[in-house]
Amino acid sequence: MTGLRAAFASTLAATLLMATPVVAQTREAPKYGGSLEIGTVYVTISALSWDSADFNWKHNHDTGQFYEQLFAADLSKARRNGGTQAFVLDAHLPSEAIRGELAESWEWKQNPLRVEIKLRKGIMFPEKAGVMKAREFVAEDVVFSYDRLDKSPKKILGYFDHVEKVEATDRHTVVFTLKHPFAEWDYRFGWGYMSGIMPKEVVDAGAANWRNATGTGPFQLTDFVSGNSNTYTRNPAYWDKEKIGDKEYQIPFVDKVVYRTIKDEATFVTALRTGKLDILEAIRWQNVESLKKSAPQLKWNRWLAQSGTFLAMRVDQDGPFKDVRVRRALNMAVNKAEIVKEYYSGNAELFAYPQHPDYGGYFEPLDKMPASVRELFAYDPARAKKLLAEAGYPKGFSFKVQVCSCNPDHMDLLPLVAAYLEQVGVKLEIQPMEYGAFLSAMTSRTMTAGYFMNNGHTNPTTTIRKSFVTGQTWNPSGWSDPAYDAKMEAAYREPDEAKREAMLRDLTREILDKAPYIWLPTPYVYSAWWPWVKNYGGELRAGAVRPGPIYARIWVDQDLKKKMGF
């Protein structure tokens, strides 16, 4: 079996900054049973779609417990097992950290360029009353799932343009034929956001209805209350095992996993403190010290946020933001170093977007950037006023900014940004929105001139493509430059990893310099869990925002939980 990206020579290793290094744990014999109550990374946001054809970013987070994929993270490489991987990156798996999930083996072949994937035999879709009888997962299920995405009217522009065809050559073999080398072939339909394998019977019954959902995964969705909870129940016929010590164990260990949706920050922090949550995956630094004092038994992991924070300035409509001098001025008007020091109390990096520091050779630190980029991160209100005057706005201007009320950090940070801008004559009209309306404003291109958001880094190529290539859904500024688009396409087709890294560094420098956003610091985030949560070290994703395989390997020490008074 060849390496997953043998054709593309990927050697990137992701390494996360930690508050306390996670070392290989003493392996206890697991115990079955109990439930796992989780406030996930997206604790404030309920499930948005159960249908992969909607191309909704959160779909995989909520369905990855039952819709499995061809590939997933090799969790044996986690730091808690003595490996090198933190598994917190939102949608980036280094080649050496990928395993076959539904795929048993794969091999690259030439003339034509294709990857031949052998599927595991004997994996079953369980019976689902009113939807389907139990049956074996086969290659046609992969072809069906791919074709349905490819034909979806909601498909991301150009998403599968590199694929010539997908075909089942026998019951347990599927072949992807490519038009040319493509750096993201495995991410796009292997372990990506929409890569879950959905049986045709679910589509026939209605894939948008959660009650019809069923897949080959370790858990089945048994209840959903919008804005409150997702409940996943153990699949007793699940095929995979977890090796602990020298012994393999059938998984999952817990009987039930429950996602709790809690919009209020104080409420979900209290839920962790009082043991109502076993794990809380995303905690702002402001809450850490109080939690450590009131619940000293909690275990911790610290990680640099997997999304960039910025104020997008629309360049696709007439107004001040058409002028690069205005965009650069607004960057210089915000004291970003002071935000790191005073607002985040040092718990942030001044520069960590659009590339992430954990992306190895794709990332170029600020001190290596051209002077024209560096000055965007230096506070210079006098220079900002001069640029505004040169652009025809000596007295400034005002504009509206939408922000999601679901994000406590943004609700606190945006008024601070507004105060800086007001010092150079630019006034913001802030419009908080619930998440559904906020997301819809972007996807329908009805947002205001300013749009304050997080956007996931995803991976070293997608972070540029989705944010700055013409017509992409997650391009809030409306950036469009045919020459830039062509350079991005060339990077995707470059099979040499070192050359591709250099191309992406150039693309990153260029877009930073053009300043379609007010670039803001990237905060550190904390995860915490109680010591009765076993076989866990703070891992968050085993694919594209997909935690399902991680939860399947956790077991709960119910005796310890009782001993601790919970």
Explain the meaning of each model-derived region.
Residues 37-110, 214:
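N-terminal lobe/hinge region of extracytoplasmic solute-binding protein
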Residues 135, 204-210, 238-290, 306, ...:
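Ligand-site clamp/hinge motif
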Residues 37-40, 134, 138-143, 171-175, ...:
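Alpha-helical secondary-structure segments
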Residues 97, 102-153, 259, 268-271, ...:
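Aromatic- and charge-enriched surface segment that lines or borders ligand/interaction sites
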Residues 74-79, 85-93, 97, 187-258, ...:
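Gly/Pro-rich hinge or "lid" segments in bacterial periplasmic/extracellular proteins
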Residues 31, 107, 111, 116-121, ...:
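Surface-exposed binding/hinge segments that line
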Residues 40, 44-46, 55-65, 225-230, ...:
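Detector for C-terminal structural segments
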Residues 165-166, 222-233, 260-318, 337, ...:
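Extracellular/periplasmic solute-recognition and catalytic clefts
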